């Protein structure tokens, strides 16, 4: 099932038991990219994507802002510190966390229609 863009973030939140760390209102995602290698994300992630990673440091926000990534989902229950969350809010990037592994999250996101 292919979802409309405005349905994808709510579907993603439900699919992976995500907990928002920043405001999600009005944010839309159009696809998903999964990688822990920042240079890979810089080279391949597209604007408006949901980025799935275990990385929680401030460089994640810089990469997300550079590529105009709509939201970042941290897996394995990982959560960045308050300064990283504040930086994401200032950049308008949604941060989410899930207790699922990256592999589990990938499967559930695909099943929920979070793909192009």
Where are these regions (language model features)?
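Conserved catalytic and cofactor-binding micro-motifs
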Residues: 1-44, 109
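Feature captures the catalytic cores and cofactor-binding loops of soluble hydro-lyases/lyases
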Residues: 35-50, 54-116
């Amino acid at each position: 099932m292919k979802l409309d863009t405005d349905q994808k973030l709510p579907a993603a939140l439900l699919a992976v038991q995500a907990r928002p760390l920043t405001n999600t209102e009005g944010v839309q995602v159009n696809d998903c990219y999964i990688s822990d290698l920042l240079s890979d994300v810089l080279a391949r992630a597209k604007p408006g994507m949901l980025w799935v990673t275990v990385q929680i440091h401030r460089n994640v926000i810089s990469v997300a802002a550079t590529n105009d990534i709509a939201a970042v989902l941290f897996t394995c229950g990982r959560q960045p510190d308050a300064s990283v969350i504040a930086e994401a809010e200032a950049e308008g990037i949604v941060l989410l966390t899930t207790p699922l592994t990256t592999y589990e999250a990938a499967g559930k996101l695909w099943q929920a229609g979070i793909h192009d």
